[in-house]
């Protein structure tokens, strides 16, 4: 705001246009639109602008324009004249005659004249959240809002033997550095208090004294240190690679990990150190070191999350945890929604979306696999073969969550299956042949398969001289002679005589035969045995 030009006096009610002459200016005042309180004898009462009509804090106060400032408005009242004997800027202007022994009135605090007209920020001015000032340097916490969310529930940080990165991590924006000077930036972690903490009844409480100082690294230097001020100010200063560990004897990547104790509260701090030429980096003087602390970055070191709210915040905001959650949900929710439920209890649940190239029927009836099961409904319409795999089909996997790519199956000729008679080998591009659903009717003894027999020949008349009572238990089942399926006879008598030939007991009077042991080849046993396999 500059000087009010003549003719614009109607801008402020009750004031006169400000003269453009040098009358009324205090001697020695700079011409940069800055005005001081005029001497009482320099002008009459009509030229004393303000006159209390605009609410001047004292009689005769004038509302004067002020240059643009960060803390004061465009118009401000000049300082009240001070009593004689004040050193500094007040001595340049003689006080009024009636100002001897003047004391500031109640409710008005006179500024220190030694500080000048604009001494600095007001006492009631507070820095915005997430901003810290040290000298000329200003540092802002970039993810301040995220840290504040965690701080409402007391932030927890996982520490492991291998080291775990912080989330939220520390990220800053720095301003006020000398572009050509070199600076070194690092973060250290210090204890907030001398207490041991425990999560109890849904909140963190103090329990006992903190343990002694644990040996280990407590400092993490930014990889870009040292560097120029222009380098630090043109980009984000991130400490995302900082890891926290509880391994006291950590030797690998010791410069990237900070050793902490579990169930202790810590406060990270940012250090900015100006590095002079020829000065070792380890030297840190108080004159060239600036420390910035943000209260919302306090955390408690834990080996496992204690508060469920913190766990949920980590899942919702951590990009790695969020990706894991999306993959987990897509693997299970997509299958449940895309594949319908079976239409009935007799249907077998097979994923048609995933296996449609191999199984054309999504819900095959179990009677197709077990035709003789009682209580199973028969298929009304004959279905085509489903055991033969079609050629030149790709496995269209739909597990997109695990990033699986479709794999093309080789088109090698499949083995013939003798179970279905008359099956034709499908050529590429050929249609599926229609065949009966059930296998052809087999003979009565088709269930029996030839087995290996002993190389022994029966003697002449062996089968006619022995009765059923002379039989004994066979040595093993593999010694039973095979029954030829092409014979029209059922083979019961022949099988009976051959089983008597291989009996280890030659007669019933032999003492080596077990007494009173029932023979497994009596008539009742034979009836039960052959009734199990109906013709």
Curated annotation (Swiss-Prot):
The modification Phosphothreonine is found at residue 303. Disulfide bonds: none annotated. One of its GO terms (molecular function) is sequence-specific DNA binding. Phosphorylations at Ser-53, Tyr-77, Ser-225 and Ser-513 are regulated by mTORC1. Phosphorylation at Tyr-530 is essential for its interaction GATA3. Phosphorylation at Tyr-220, Tyr-266 and Tyr-305 enhances its transcriptional activator activity. Phosphorylation at Thr-303 is required for its interaction with NFATC2. The keyword ATP-binding does not apply. There is a cross-link at residue 314 (Glycyl lysine isopeptide (Lys-Gly) (interchain with G-Cter in ubiquitin)). Residues 141-326 bind DNA. The modification Phosphoserine is found at residues 53, 225, 513. T-cell specific. Keywords: Activator, Asthma, Disease variant, DNA-binding, Isopeptide bond, Nucleus, Phosphoprotein, Repressor, Transcription, Transcription regulation, Ubl conjugation. Its main location: nucleus. One of its GO terms (cellular component) is neuronal cell body. InterPro entries: p53-like_TF_DNA-bd_sf, T-box_DNA-bd, T-box_sf, TF_T-box, TF_T-box_CS. Lineage-defining transcription factor which initiates Th1 lineage development from naive Th precursor cells both by activating Th1 genetic programs and by repressing the opposing Th2 and Th17 genetic programs. Activates transcription of a set of genes important for Th1 cell function, including those encoding IFN-gamma and the chemokine receptor CXCR3. Induces permissive chromatin accessibilty and CpG methylation in IFNG. Interacts with RUNX1, RUNX3, ITK, ABL1, RELA, CDK9 and KDM6B. The phosphorylated form (at Thr-303) interacts with NFATC2. Interacts with SMARCA4 in a KDM6B-dependent manner. Interacts with CCTN1. Interacts with USP10. The phosphorylated form (at Tyr-530) interacts with GATA3. This is T-box transcription factor TBX21. The gene is TBX21.
